[in-house]
A protein has these predicted regions:
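Sec-dependent N-terminal signal peptides
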Residues: 5-13
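N-terminal secretory signal peptides
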Residues: 20-79
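Sequence contexts marking disulfide-bonded cysteines in secreted/extracellular proteins
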Residues: 29-31, 41, 102-104, 116-118
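Intrinsically disordered, low-complexity, charged/polar segments
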Residues: 78-86, 119-124
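Flexible glycine-rich surface loops and low-complexity tracts that mediate binding to linear polymers
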Residues: 83-111
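OB-fold/S1-family single-stranded nucleic acid-binding modules
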Residues: 105-130
Length: 130
């Protein structure tokens, strides 16, 4: 009886793990998104959470330019518009500074927030928001 319970428990646990790992590869990266309007490029900036839409924004360091991570208009269920690891690090009290590989959903226009997705990030430092 105990052996059967242990075996059943292991089967349930292993089945749950394989279900999680099987679903992950199906999420496509930002760079593969079908609605991109240009090439991806690296932006050295500060990623923060704001009140409003889009909530996650990337401010290019040395400029007043703000890029918005699309979370509605260009959100498709099978694509990731921002790496989950970055989202886990962000909250209203901190910001991330680093080099972000971004891909554009809209063209850059003066006075308008350009909508993007983030493919990856390097040299990321978390700091308290000022």
């Amino acid at each position: 009886m105990i052996k059967a319970s242990v075996a059943l428990s292991l089967l349930v646990i292993c089945g749950g793990v394989s279900a999680i790992s099987v679903s992950s590869p199906f999420e496509k990266s930002c760079r593969q998104h079908p609605q991109l309007v240009g090439k991806c490029s690296t932006v050295h900036g500060t990623l923060s959470v704001y009140n409003g839409n889009p909530a996650v924004r990337l401010r290019r360091i040395g400029t007043k330019r703000i890029l918005g991570v699309s979370d509605q208009r260009f959100k498709l269920p099978e694509y990731s518009n921002i790496p989950e690891a970055l989202m886990k690090q962000l909250n209203g009290e901190n910001e991330l500074v680093g080099d972000f590989l971004v891909c554009p959903f809209t063209r850059s226009k003066p006075g308008e927030m350009q909508l993007i997705c983030i493919e990856s990030a390097k040299n990321v430092v978390t700091r308290k928001r000022a």
